[in-house]
């Protein structure tokens, strides 16, 4: 989604889907303008991940556009999802080191992804789920943190015609794959990890790829329960 997060793009491009019983769509780049320019924003200076039509806010910290769905990137993803109706959606970002379950229906998928890793691979992440009483960090709602995001729309606002909702995971890659996730990360965390990326991108990818690929394969195999 964000062009200044190249690690997420490279990991998706390098991921090989092995034989499975489910259709899988991989979209390495959802913001072509941002990817080309190495910026979070599209050519109009808007953050596409603040432009989705759920909990959209004009006064978002990041520029959200004049109205929800004003940007071609958010509309393209909306239309793609509406056509495919995926049961599971995983969006990769960089580099808060989190597995965010957007919506109560997403808790089980987040926990399956967490369980797919070994202890060392989990260290740079934290698990965040909406359902109270489960996970490392318990939250009722996270609407205020990322208004108008893909996770907000797909996890809370999107309901298919059969009344089902997709399991929506926002997977934030680690700040440092060799260290436990810090309790807090300052606003400068992305610039720091970008500098490290410029120095040794392969080292970073080699450090995170095993855990990420285990999570993605577990997610592909996971079958969400159907509400009665």
Where are these regions (language model features)?
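Active-site-proximal helix/loop segments of hydrolytic enzymes
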Residues: 72, 78, 84, 94-170
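Active-site-adjacent mobile loop/cap segments within catalytic or ligand-binding domains
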Residues: 98-102, 143-228
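Active-site/substrate-binding loop(s) of hydrolase catalytic cores
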Residues: 1-119
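A generic signature of intrinsically disordered, low-complexity regions enriched in glycine/proline
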Residues: 37, 51-55, 59, 135, ...
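Surface-exposed helix-capping loop/turn segments at secondary-structure junctions
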Residues: 84-87, 123-127, 220-228
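Short glycine/proline- and acidic residue-enriched helix-loop micro-motifs
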Residues: 56-67, 131, 183, 189-199
């Amino acid at each position: 989604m964000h062009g200044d997060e190249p690690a997420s793009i490279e990991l998706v491009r390098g991921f090989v889907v092995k034989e499975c019983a489910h259709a899988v769509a991989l979209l390495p780049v959802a913001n072509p303008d941002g990817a080309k320019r190495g910026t979070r924003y599209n050519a109009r200076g808007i953050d596409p991940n603040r432009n989705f039509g759920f909990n959209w806010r004009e006064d978002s910290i990041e520029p959200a556009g004049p109205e929800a769905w004003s940007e071609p990137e958010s509309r393209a993803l909306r239309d793609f999802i509406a056509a495919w109706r995926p049961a599971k959606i995983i969006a990769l970002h960089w580099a808060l080191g989190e597995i965010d379950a957007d919506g109560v229906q997403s808790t089980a998928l987040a926990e399956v992804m967490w369980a797919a890793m070994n202890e060392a691979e989990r260290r740079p992440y934290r698990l965040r789920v909406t359902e109270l009483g489960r996970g490392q960090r318990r939250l009722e709602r996270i609407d205020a943190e990322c208004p108008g995001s893909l996770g907000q729309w797909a996890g809370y606002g999107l309901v298919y015609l059969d009344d089902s909702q997709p399991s929506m995971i926002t997977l934030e890659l680690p700040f440092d794959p060799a260290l436990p996730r810090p309790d807090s990360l300052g606003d400068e965390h992305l610039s720091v990890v970008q500098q490290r990326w410029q120095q040794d991108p392969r080292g970073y990818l080699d450090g995170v790829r095993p855990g990420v690929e285990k999570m993605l394969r577990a997610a592909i195999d996971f079958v969400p329960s159907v509400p009665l």
